[in-house]
Amino acid sequence: MTWKDIIENEQQKPYYGKLKEEIDKRYENSIVFPEKQNIFKAFSLTKFEDLKVVILGQDPYHGIGQAQGLSFSTPSNIKNPPSMVNILKEINDDLGKKSVCEDGDLTPWAKQGIMLLNTILTVEQGLAKSHHNLGWEIFTDNIIKYISDNKENVIFLLWGSPAISKTKLIDKNKHFILTAPHPSPLSVYRGFYGCKHFSKTNEILKKLNKEEIIW
């Protein structure tokens, strides 16, 4: 199965028809991020068969030009948002070297088998969580469950309560789950700094004889 097959299967379900209708309407009548062609970018950059790691975000950044369809990531010409700054600092502290993604564009991670998935895939300009409860959560919950059921030894990095609440969808006997507070300035000092998820992920991959991530 490819992501295309998996997504098309979801698109046949009744909830998705309602979701698509609502999202199409909002793209028509207001400013919505990311650009429509980037909604499923996380799926196009990380092939299902190459999947090693899932990093769950919440909804896309809601500032102009920030969202690009990958959780936490921004285009390289955009100033790094605070959460991204904190992620880069933790990588530096954890690994003793700078990230390959200092510019905030996490595309190199996605190409190494890291799925950067938001649980809500669209948002209106300036309005965080404005597309909450339209149906995206059903879609992404089903994607997480599909990964859990059909893959083995995927490492899930769950940062913050909303992401950690998805633990129930993941088979802990087949997969690895690392949790920490969210990297936002509000919670970064509650345990995101010092979580060492980047070195821990590579330790797990090494034990599995898989190629480590160049963070």
Swiss-Prot record:
Catalytic residues, chain numbering: D59 (proton acceptor)
Organism, as annotated: Aliarcobacter butzleri (strain RM4018)
Gene Ontology annotations of biological process type: base-excision repair, AP site formation via deaminated base removal
Protein name: Uracil-DNA glycosylase
Pfam families: UDG
Function per UniProt: Excises uracil residues from the DNA which can arise as a result of misincorporation of dUMP residues by DNA polymerase or due to deamination of cytosine.
Lineage of the organism: Bacteria, Pseudomonadati, Campylobacterota, Epsilonproteobacteria, Campylobacterales
Xref: InterPro entries: UDG_fam1 (IPR002043), Ura-DNA_Glyclase_AS (IPR018085), Uracil-DNA_glycosylase-like (IPR005122), Uracil-DNA_glycosylase-like_sf (IPR036895)
Main localization (coarse): cytoplasm
